[in-house]
UniProtKB/Swiss-Prot annotation:
Highest taxon above the source species: Eukaryota
Protein name as it appears in the record: Conotoxin reg3j
Localisation per UniProt entry: Secreted
Chief place of localization: secreted
GO molecular function: toxin activity
Family under the similarity heading: Belongs to the conotoxin M superfamily.
Keyword Secreted: yes
Residues spanning the signal sequence: none
Domain description: The cysteine framework is III (CC-C-C-CC).
Amino acid sequence: GCCSPWNCIQLRACGCC
């Protein structure tokens, strides 16, 4: 999902990092 901890770049795009 969007907030998976192994993908900080995507987390930032989703506002989760």
